[in-house]
Amino acid sequence: MKKRVVAKAVTAIKKTAVLSPAARDKQVNASFSENALKMMKKRYLAKREDGTQETPAELFHRVARGLADVEKTKYGKSATEAAKLEAEFFDIMANKEHTPAGRTLTNVGNGTPIIANCIVLPVMDTLDDIFQTLKEAALLQQAGSGLGFSFGHLRPAGMPTKRTNGMSSGPIEFLKIYNTSFGIIKQQGRHGANMAIMPVHHPDIMDFIHCKKVEGEIRNFNISVGITDEFMKAVTEKPDAPWLATWNGKKIKPHRVLRSPNGAVIGFEELDITAKQLFDELVEGAWFNGEPGVVNLDEANRTNPLPQLGEIDCTNPCGEQFLHHYDVCNLGSINLSAFVKNGKMDYARLKQVTRTAVRLHDNVIDLYAHPVQKVTDRAQGTRRIGLGIMGFADMLYKMGVQYNSDAGRAVGEKVMSFINEEARKMSQLLAKEKGTFTLWQGSVWSKKKMKMRNAALTTVAPTGSISMFTDCSSGIEPNFALYFTKQDKDGLQYKYLNPVFEAALKDRGIDIDKDGIMEELIKSGSVQNLMSLPKDLRDTFVVSMDISAEDHIKMQAAFQKHVDNSISKTINFPNSATREEVAAGYVMAWKLKCKGMTFYRDGSRQVQVLNIGDASKIKSTTDAIGSAAAAKQIEKPLNLLMDQHRLTPRIRPEVVSGRTYKVKTGYGSLFVTVNDDELGAPLEIFATLGKSGGFFQEQSEALCRLISVALRSHIKVEEIIQQLKGIRGPMPVMTNKGTVLSLPDAIAQILEEHVTHATKPANEQAQVAELVAAATAPVQQSKEVKAKQSLASYGMMPGCPECGGNLTLKEGCMACGSCGFSRCG
């Protein structure tokens, strides 16, 4: 039997008097699994000049020493006091009880500027501001920060720009510029994460919802729609009422941004849409590939601790930190699984670790040296920290409590309430010791007359990497599976067998390699179909796909009651989930006051981070996913692929303007009208030839209808001209501008003239004069042409109407040498 390579559990290390420092460090290093070490070497363990890397114990010593030194250098503590704090900081990390987030682990004590994981930057509505923010963002990305941006302040596509007297390209075009720029920057062993948010009342919201419909597009951003109570009430209470966007304080119709096949903005059309219809578009995106997510802006601002700074409009990349512009938060998480002793929580130890962690993260702020000074200044003003949790699902496993139950939610509420309360008590103690955050006056804490060191304290981050090296479940998420393969952004794969489950089987004397247990785990990741296992084990060891979306949402809402900021959580759906189920989930989460909502339907992306099944069948991820996205679309169901790429004609505006041309054809004078859209591009075409109901009139009408549909579907006019120009008919005719071979050729020539030579009349009177001149000039000129030219001057050989062969001039008449057709009879 082949040996399994899986993550093994290691009991939390406890410092004892009998261990020397060297022995203690050796024990710490030995406590990490193969997977954990692989990931730590890639991301967190510093490299020495000789090419070797530090050990995990050395990492923790480096971080603990660097943060404890703050107490001496800034707050005047003695060396003994600082050493005591250093030992406490080291212990909570070495015991896997608490872990700071990645940037803190990587940079503290390493001679590298200390920066926060999470920052929000403004994107305001001037070109100078847009590119100033991009410059600041590039510097912060390079340093290792994750960034959030609200693109809701940018004017909609098609709006006038004063400086250039042109029209705005719209927020999505600038989002693409940011995305491309960030794709070039790679942070210390990791790709930069970014969040783009647009409020639901922005006129370009439809364009935003669909901007990541093709997998691999805008791949350096998560996107979320900022919903409001007004919008959700309209969805649930007035589903048929029109929905109006808001811009500059005015209610206007939302619009669809029109793009050419190469993606360039060519215009926009107003939409008559209800809130429910817009909501359905959002749901469709979430159902299709998990994006966009949703953030509840009104709920976030109801709990905004710094109302004097204005409303919050954005979050960090993972959505758990609602921040003002230039505000920051450093994250860290308590591993709840480490506090279970004999099936019960050790709340005394949890209290100690919580308070130590608050001090640790407060000290991180004093070391900040962001490449953008405004960020460091704001951090000193608010002193936000994001103390969260991980290992919750494993904690429930050890306690024998089912995740998707009232008991599970009660445990979650109790432990989060305890941590939140202890964190606040510690912040009050630090305020007495070191002073309040400088923006305390005007905050919610000043109104409550509570002296606080930190504006906000708790959050729940996804903990993807730090939970990997502590071998525990992520955040408040249920385990994805009891056996799975995790794939990171660089394509590296890590196999995991849940250590708590493996230990539970061992305690009961159950052999995992018998009765098809391991085979079922590899196949499905779940034990729900293993009836040979005791029922209490099957009830306790549930995984994400065993849990209904409703229970996922209820758990998130239970935690949200006791979290200062927000929670990063994914609501997992099976692949068979319907759009209606996703929609119901969004409504439920809003009603339960969840601040953020991310839904994911299993298998709806070509590449996903966690996978169940044989590793050989799991797709690898590389930086080339963007360029490969189109090829990978063949994996989509055919109907979804067709929907994704189907062209839809835009709605015709009620009023358009254009020009009418007259051209002589072999069948009489053809009058062609070309109408333009608001940007001056051809929108539709009409042609009149002969009497209504005649053969040539019906042909020209049919042709013009198809051309108009193509134009309104954003097909390039040059493509249409190329297809029609040069088509030969049996009755060509000469004009002063050359040969007109057929009706299609005549229409193509007029379209070409319209887009390449026509100039817009200065006013309506000039337009009328132009039309009159156009209508009379060809007639006068044709008389002169007739006198000077003969049939031999047709130039290009027209086609025979009978067989398609060439017509030639014979005996004063056009005749076909192939079939004998003669125009003269």
Where are these regions (language model features)?
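Short, Gly/Pro- and small/polar-rich lid/capping loops
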Residues: 613-669, 779-796, 802
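Phosphate-backbone binding interfaces of nucleic-acid-interacting proteins
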Residues: 684, 690-772
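Internal maturation/activation junctions in enzymes
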Residues: 247, 353-376, 380, 384, ...
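Residues immediately within or flanking Cys/His clusters that coordinate Zn2+
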Residues: 797, 813, 821
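Function-dense linear segments that define catalytic or interfacial modules
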Residues: 46, 65-73, 90-115, 119-163, ...
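Conserved, charged catalytic cores of large soluble enzymes
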Residues: 14-86, 163-177, 187-190, 194-304, ...
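Short cysteine-rich clusters marking metal-coordination/redox-active sites
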Residues: 800-803, 816-819
